[in-house]
A protein has these predicted regions:
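Protease-labile, long low-complexity intrinsically disordered regions enriched in Pro/Ser/Thr
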Residues: 1-209
Length: 209
């Protein structure tokens, strides 16, 4: 028996919106149908791991879990099983996405409510299956003030290695920095951002080749 997991690109409103302010508080707002029992707040800061399982609710949640140096793999698996996967499936899913889910950064995870999945991606099986479990994990990246400051410094210094660790998120964060920059810095930051992103794409293409 083998498992196949996939991800794709889509554009729709997620049931939870989250933002982080300068004080490190995460504002969580429920904005869609369906029930979400819990979320996992996770942070990887240069290998220092923090995470905490919280009940999903509107309001402010302070992102200051203790440094555990432990991965939330078991908590992720338990959350997947609670939403319909078999233990073997949950274990395989976490192993498949581990490097991406637990890379450096701050993010939250939760399982998208089934009714949201069915409305966005209707599924029709003929003949009908006895049972169907559809478990989609939502990952929301939180841009911390520390990350914004680090990227700003790296852009001004043209420090490509420091920028490269932000991977596919660099352009989105960088655009926000450019938009909020002073007139004096905006053009330089824009040029450095384009240069860094081009260098990263060239490196990726070489590795793929």
């Amino acid at each position: 028996e083998k498992f196949l997991f996939y991800r794709g690109v889509g554009r729709f409103t997620l049931p939870i919106a989250a933002t982080m302010d300068a004080a490190g508080q995460v504002s969580i707002r429920k904005q869609g149908p369906g029930r979400i029992d819990e979320i996992i707040l996770f942070s990887n800061d240069r290998g220092r791991l923090r995470y905490e399982v919280r009940r999903a609710a509107d309001g402010l949640v302070t992102v200051d879990p203790p440094v555990t140096d432990q991965e939330p793999s078991l908590e992720l698996q338990r959350m997947l099983v609670a939403n319909g996967l078999y233990p073997e499936e949950a274990n395989a899913m976490v192993k498949t996405w581990r490097d991406s889910w637990l890379e450096e950064g701050t993010r939250l995870f939760y399982v998208v409510p089934r009714r949201v999945i069915d409305s966005v991606l209707p599924l029709d099986i003929n003949p009908p299956a006895d049972d169907v479990a559809r478990v989609f994990v939502a990952r929301t990246e939180l841009v911390t003030p520390a990350a914004t400051n680090e990227i700003t410094r790296a852009l001004l210094a043209n420090d490509i290695p420091a920028l490269a660790k932000y991977g596919r998120f660099l352009e989105a964060i960088g655009r926000r920095i450019v938009e909020n920059a002073s007139e004096a810095d905006r053009m330089l930051l824009e040029q450095r951002l384009q240069s860094a992103y081009a260098a990263m794409m060239t490196f990726r293409d070489r590795c793929a080749g």
